[in-house]
Amino acid sequence: LNSCIKITKNDLILGMEVDFLLIGQGLAGTVLSHRLIQDGHSVHLIDDGDPNSSSKIAAGLYNPVTGRNLVKTWLADILFEEIERFYHEMERLLDKDLVHSLGIYRPFVSYEEQNEWVAKSADPQFNAFIKQVFTQSRNKGVKDPFGGVLLKSTGYINTLELVNGYSEWLRERNLLTKAVLSEKDLVQTKDGNWQFKEILAKKIVFTNGIQARNNTFFNWIPFIPVKGEILTVKQDYYSSEIINRGVFRIDMGEGIGKVGSTYNNSEVNLCPTDAGKKEILDKLEQLIEKEVIAIKDHQVGIRPGIRDRKPVLGKHPSKDNVYLFGGFGAKGVSLVPYLSKQMVKLMVCGEEPHKEVNINRFFKYI
């Protein structure tokens, strides 16, 4: 937007003046705006209301032990102190049931893996997140001949309820505009502020997920959009735990389970595929003994991944009042509550975030 039209403040339509204008009200925009309001700042959000946004499709899992090598997720000890505390706070604000604290049961595929987890259970780095290691099948409808590990400090957040509930909360206070933002709608004033229609903002923050790559401020960030498919299935099966091996299965009650997800960065669109459905069902068959009776829903979302698999927090290199808070991929539920606090410190106090997530690691791409 270097060629933006310059106008004077006197030319503005009389309207709302705010400290921060956030572009996008998915999970990132929801949490960051709440942090800013808590800190005493005025905000306004713009969102297109897309029902297929990744925040609305996401399963919302939080799990401290992830990846093929089953390691503690980055900053797990810090992140997981914040997760349930923050989302319980949002439950109280919105009067919604958002937090589902459930153990995650991961079956072993060999005695070698079983032995590894027995050893990990004695490791102080892991035992805070391990509830129990089973060396035999639990005979609960899960295919686990070698036993498995039951993890704690885990569960899922109902992100659809969170985002929609917070959207309503914002609308009641005239803090949300439903609009598809075009760059020509953002006009920089002579004093450096930003105008969107009748709103004048001191700072703007892009919290719009993968769409941030389409604006000229941040089109140099190496976003990697990833297509993920999720099925809602009917089975004669119930579990009070999330089952996770190859795919996750979250029990929604009455024989309904949410199962996913796929990972596809070569065919990035919102079209459900037979290949994605087959992949999920094949992996579910290897996990759960009961067959699928019916497929109730087949959803697709686009995760906003980054090349180095870490999110991006920071200020534009040449515009002091333009920021990016995004790239959370599949771990937004875990990362956003803690990193949103770092983002507020950056925008308000000038404190730089962790180097692993700092936007300056990508300045070489400009």
What function would you assign to each model-found segment?
Residues 68, 96-106, 131-169, 179, ...:
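Helix-loop-beta segment of a Rossmann-like dinucleotide-binding subdomain
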Residues 297-366:
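C-terminal catalytic lobe of FAD-dependent flavoproteins
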Residues 38-56:
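Glycine-rich FAD pyrophosphate-binding loop
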Residues 154-237, 241-244:
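Predominantly flavin-linked oxidoreductase catalytic cores and closely associated redox partners
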Residues 20-44:
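N-terminal Rossmann-like FAD-binding beta1-loop-alpha1 element of flavoenzymes
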Residues 31-35, 56, 61, 66, ...:
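Active-site substrate-recognition segment that forms the wall
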Residues 61-140:
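Dinucleotide-binding Rossmann-like beta1-alpha1 core, especially the glycine-rich loop
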Residues 71-79, 149-165, 271-275, 334:
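Short beta-strand to alpha-helix junction loop
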